[in-house]
Amino acid sequence: MEIILFLTMMVMITYVFSGYLYRVALVQSSRVDLIFTRFENMCFKIIGTDLEHMSAKTYVKHFLAFNGFMGFITFVLLIVQQWLFLNPNHNLNQSIDLAFNTAISFLTNSNLQHYNGESDVTYLTQMIVMTYLMFTSSASGYAVCIAMLRRLTGLTNIIGNFYQDIVRFIVRVLLPLSCLISILLMTQGVPQTLHANLMIRTLSGHIQHIAFGPIASLESIKHLGTNGGGFLAGNSATPFENPNIWSNFIEMGSMMLLPMSMLFLFGRMLSRHGKRVHRHALILFVAMFFIFIAILTLTMWSEYRGNPILANLGIYGPNMEGKEVRFGAGLSALFTVITTAFTTGSVNNMHDSLTPIGGLGPMVLMMLNVVFGGEGVGLMNLLIFVLLTVFICSLMVGKTPEYLNMPIGAREMKCIVLVFLIHPILILVFSALAFMIPGASESITNPSFHGISQVMYEMTSAAANNGSGFEGLKDDTTFWNISTGIIMLLSRYIPIILQLMIASSLVNKKSYHQDKYTIAIDKPYFGVSLIVFIVLLSGLTFIPVLLLGPIGEFLTLK
């Protein structure tokens, strides 16, 4: 019942919050202008931008240059961190390959962590590098999505200014909400301090070091920005990051807030005036929510069912291996599905200890990479499947392929197919390399089917810019650092470039007025068709490897 109430509340909150996002996205005046405008203008002066509207090509150039500059600075700071200030625990520099992986991971909103948060980064890099990139990577994804929506919806004839979009989103959305969430988490016991690690003497007489630091400030944007990188190695399973059931709900709600609001925002932009949500967006929301609930149900069923091997020995009950007692199997499964559906990557339980079908659910969500997804890019990925569905359905019934009165031609379809293929190609090719390259497979700690699942999960998490992992994998090696770094880089930027190209190509075409020869995208049957094509196309791509991984493991448990 608590899960149903939580999900219902989040749907209502995101629907209302999308109205505020609408005013932020379209640079409309609001009551908060007196608070934020001066700070925004100061940021624009520091950046040196004159807020001129950019072409799509210029927008992408500035997006890539901004991200490239941040990535370079991050890499440099990580390899010299031991000589900088705010290092009371005397942590050492990261190796070149690990710094490469870490910089790309946080730059691309993935937060795949091959390092130990307690010992491999300093307070300075946690705050200046990790926390800063959590803001900018999230805002970058939002900015390119808004640029795409402006063109697709025809609400304006401009794509916008990259720096204006990113600054407004950080100042008016991320910063206020992060401060609020940080305060809420601190009231639940999450630390926020620059004090060095505590050194205590245990009852047995041994000395123990307890790691903590400025956790609350990182924890808030970690979930709000769908980042996922933890201050501590145990992530949100540790009491310092996620002390109780209330902090657990705060963190889950933070993950869901912006991606769900973006879908409603799309509907408000389609309705032109923003006071209501267009039926097309509601159909998309219901379709994605249906997939989300289906996988949540499957995951919870598997985790409550427990391990059949133990059941045969007379030991019944849910699968509690790798889980925190304060959350139990139900809230652990919910957190797992949310963190993979919304591509956050934070964890409150050990995913490597999930049952085979329990691990299949989050893996499938990352393979689909469209069920709400991350900040901005999740909606962009969904729209690719929408365009693909419109095109196929139109040809199947002999109608004209068009979307929002824009005809879909050969050029757009080539880009759409490329975006669709990049994701599975990166996952499958690099997974195969992990088994072929000498030394790479030595990181696998489980034999047979589960070992394949470990590799597939790691590569899928990197390709989906998620960041969670089956942490039984020994991934801090040169191969895993470089390979997952390349995957995160390619899977983030190539689709974004192609998606903006698709939007620009569509709007440059002559408007096509909808008639009886076009597919109605605001009807329930379109939502059903979308679900079928998402499952069918992704299923044909990944079913063979899933049979070798979690499904094969499930069939062997008796």
Swiss-Prot record:
One of its GO terms (biological process) is potassium ion transmembrane transport. The chain crosses the membrane at residues 1-21, 66-86, 127-147, 166-186, 245-265, 281-301, 327-347, 354-374, 377-397, 416-436, 482-502, 531-551. The keyword Transmembrane helix applies. It is found in: Cell membrane. Its main location: membrane. One of its GO terms (cellular component) is plasma membrane. Keywords: Cell membrane, Ion transport, Membrane, Potassium, Potassium transport, Transmembrane, Transmembrane helix, Transport. One of its GO terms (molecular function) is P-type potassium transmembrane transporter activity. Part of the high-affinity ATP-driven potassium transport (or Kdp) system, which catalyzes the hydrolysis of ATP coupled with the electrogenic transport of potassium into the cytoplasm. This subunit binds the extracellular potassium ions and delivers the ions to the membrane domain of KdpB through an intramembrane tunnel. HAMAP family: KdpA. Belongs to the KdpA family. This is Potassium-transporting ATPase potassium-binding subunit.
